[in-house]
């Protein structure tokens, strides 16, 4: 929608989180909490957006540094929601449209709900519209009081409510839609004569009714959307609801989740159809997974690009890595940042890679460390191979050409280059470059001392 701005209240410390991190920056489904209502506001067409910051203001500002549609307003002392909005007013000087007022700790709010709220507000010519919900247990919420015609008369906070008012089950979400003219003409008139000695934004509702301005409420069907997060238990509850949404959207797009309740996928992860994901997997960051992949139980994937038909076996950990098509990884493999596996590569159990590129068809089937390495096509890395990439001061690279066979228990002391079509014998420590087509072997010749064991037993 056009001519819409938003104010998001994010100045509170979040004492009940018992954390050194300000509440709105706590992560939920892969994003700081504040990102979710911000995304909802943007989804409804709001621009600019003013964030009211207070505790750890610089950390919140830094999060949105460079975002051209966002301004920050400082609420140095937290004196209530009305005071917070008053602090935001200068950032919207000259704005004459409709203002959405949101809470920074409502990560479940959808952009579509705000679009509906705006449409309802404008269609009724309202000055103020409150988003409400009807709850079986409204304890702790402000109650919405209406007249016989259904118009909103006022909102009373629970601490200030009478027993009769506490029996009302329609509650205030803390989310509002207001015309800028009414809002900024009256925000300075709020008082703090209440149980908490704060400037309540809700008092604008009663003020609108007294002045004959239209004040309405739109009840939301899904009360989860307006759930505020105040402590770690509520954070986990909100995260669970977000995961259900994310997982449902993925399943409807053709992804199979064996147990959605035990699958942890961040918002923004892209997964292709016919991919199968087993329980207890965590997929985070800007990860992209292709079509027809299999992700087995206990896998952790962070910020990776995975091509079609890959299989990630149980217990593997993948970080900042790229897998092309038809790659097999694991079980119990660890791909560290900078790993690139080309088509048909196999990484087996207890293999660790870091800043390593493996060419098409190459394999390291078990018990291997490959760090700072570039490996060609159709290379076999034997069991127990180690690239010795660190000399105690600097890291060095290992370069292995195409069609090389590396036997078991080989150490490649970098910097070193192994030419194409060569063979490294089992147990060899490679300290010099190996020419193409060569055999490299550095073992001590085997000596068999016949009868030695029998003689030793007799001595004991």
From Swiss-Prot:
Organism: Pelobacter propionicus (strain DSM 2379 / NBRC 103807 / OttBd1)
Pathway(s) where this gene product acts: Nucleotide-sugar biosynthesis; UDP-N-acetyl-alpha-D-glucosamine biosynthesis; N-acetyl-alpha-D-glucosamine 1-phosphate from alpha-D-glucosamine 6-phosphate (route II): step 2/2; Nucleotide-sugar biosynthesis; UDP-N-acetyl-alpha-D-glucosamine biosynthesis; UDP-N-acetyl-alpha-D-glucosamine from N-acetyl-alpha-D-glucosamine 1-phosphate: step 1/1; Bacterial outer membrane biogenesis; LPS lipid A biosynthesis
Region (Linker): 233-253
Entry's EC annotation: 2.7.7.23, 2.3.1.157
Annotated region described as Pyrophosphorylase, given as residue ranges: 1-232
Function description: Catalyzes the last two sequential reactions in the de novo biosynthetic pathway for UDP-N-acetylglucosamine (UDP-GlcNAc). The C-terminal domain catalyzes the transfer of acetyl group from acetyl coenzyme A to glucosamine-1-phosphate (GlcN-1-P) to produce N-acetylglucosamine-1-phosphate (GlcNAc-1-P), which is converted into UDP-GlcNAc by the transfer of uridine 5-monophosphate (from uridine 5-triphosphate), a reaction catalyzed by the N-terminal domain.
A single GO BP: peptidoglycan biosynthetic process
Gene Ontology CC: one annotated term: cytoplasm
Taxonomy, superkingdom: Bacteria
Cofactor info, note text: Binds 1 Mg(2+) ion per subunit.
Cofactor list: Mg(2+)
Catalytic residues (UniProt): 366 (proton acceptor)
Catalysed conversion reaction: alpha-D-glucosamine 1-phosphate + acetyl-CoA = N-acetyl-alpha-D-glucosamine 1-phosphate + CoA + H(+); N-acetyl-alpha-D-glucosamine 1-phosphate + UTP + H(+) = UDP-N-acetyl-alpha-D-glucosamine + diphosphate
Residues the record lists as binding Mg(2+): 105, 230
Keywords: Acyltransferase, Cell shape, Cell wall biogenesis/degradation, Cytoplasm, Magnesium, Metal-binding, Multifunctional enzyme, Nucleotidyltransferase, Peptidoglycan synthesis, Repeat, Transferase
Residues annotated for acetyl-CoA binding in this entry: 389-390, 408, 426, 443
Similarity remark: In the N-terminal section; belongs to the N-acetylglucosamine-1-phosphate uridyltransferase family. In the C-terminal section; belongs to the transferase hexapeptide repeat family.
Subunit record text: Homotrimer.
Region (N-acetyltransferase): 254-460
Chain residues that bind UDP-N-acetyl-alpha-D-glucosamine: 9-12, 23, 75, 80-81, 142, 157, 172, 230, 336, 354, 369, 380
Xref: NCBIfam families: glmU, PRK14354.1, PRK14355.1
GO molecular function, one term: UDP-N-acetylglucosamine diphosphorylase activity
Localization: Cytoplasm
Protein name: Bifunctional protein GlmU
One Pfam family hit: NTP_transferase
């Amino acid at each position: 929608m056009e001519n819409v701005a938003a104010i998001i209240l994010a100045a509170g410390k979040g004492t009940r989180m018992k954390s050194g991190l300000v509440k709105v920056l706590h992560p939920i489904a892969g994003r700081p909490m504040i990102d979710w209502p911000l995304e909802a506001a943007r989804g409804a067409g709001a621009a600019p957006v003013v964030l009211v910051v207070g505790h750890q203001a610089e950390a919140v500002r830094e999060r949105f540094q460079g975002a051209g549609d966002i301004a920050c307003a400082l609420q140095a002392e937290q004196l209530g929601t009305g005071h917070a909005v008053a602090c935001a007013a200068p950032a919207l000087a000259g704005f004459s449209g409709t203002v959405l007022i949101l809470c920074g700790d409502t990560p479940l709010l959808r952009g579509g709900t705000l679009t509906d709220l705006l449409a309802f507000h404008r269609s009724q010519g309202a000055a103020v519209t409150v988003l409400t919900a009807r709850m079986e247990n409204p304890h702790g919420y402000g109650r919405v009081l209406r007249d016989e015609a259904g118009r909103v008369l006022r909102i009373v906070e629970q601490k200030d409510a009478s027993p009769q008012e506490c029996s009302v089950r329609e509650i205030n979400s803390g989310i509002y839609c207001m015309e800028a003219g009414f809002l900024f003409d009256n925000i300075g008139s709020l008082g703090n004569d209440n149980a908490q000695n704060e400037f309540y934004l809700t008092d604008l509702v009663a003020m609108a009714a007294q002045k004959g301005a239209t004040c309405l409420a739109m009840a939301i069907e899904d009360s989860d959307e307006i759930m505020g997060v105040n402590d770690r238990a509520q954070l986990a509850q909100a995260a669970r609801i977000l995961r259900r949404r994310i997982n449902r959207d993925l399943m409807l797009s053709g992804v199979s989740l064996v147990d959605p309740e035990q699958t942890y996928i961040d918002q923004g992860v892209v997964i292709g159809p016919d991919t199968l994901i087993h329980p207890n997997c965590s997929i985070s960051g800007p990860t992209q997974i292709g079509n027809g992949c299999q992700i087995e139980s206990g896998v952790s994937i962070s910020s990776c690009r995975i091509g079609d038909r890959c299989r990630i076996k149980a217990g593997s950990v993948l970080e900042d890595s790229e897998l092309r098509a038809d790659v097999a990884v694991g079980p119990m493999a660890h791909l560290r940042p900078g790993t690139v596996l080309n088509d048909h590569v196999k990484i087996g159990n207890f293999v660790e890679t870091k800043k390593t590129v493996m060419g098409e068809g190459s394999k390291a089937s078990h018990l291997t460390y490959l760090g700072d390495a570039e490996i060609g096509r159709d290379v076999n890395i034997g069991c127990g191979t180690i690239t010795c990439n660190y000399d105690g001061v600097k890291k060095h690279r290992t370069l292995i050409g195409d069609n090389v066979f590396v036997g078991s228990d080989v150490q490649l002391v970098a910097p070193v280059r192994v030419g194409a079509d060569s063979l490294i014998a089992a147990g060899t420590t490679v300290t010099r470059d190996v020419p193409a087509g060569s055999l490299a072997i550095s073992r001590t010749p085997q000596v068999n001392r016949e009868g030695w064991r029998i003689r030793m037993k007799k001595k004991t």
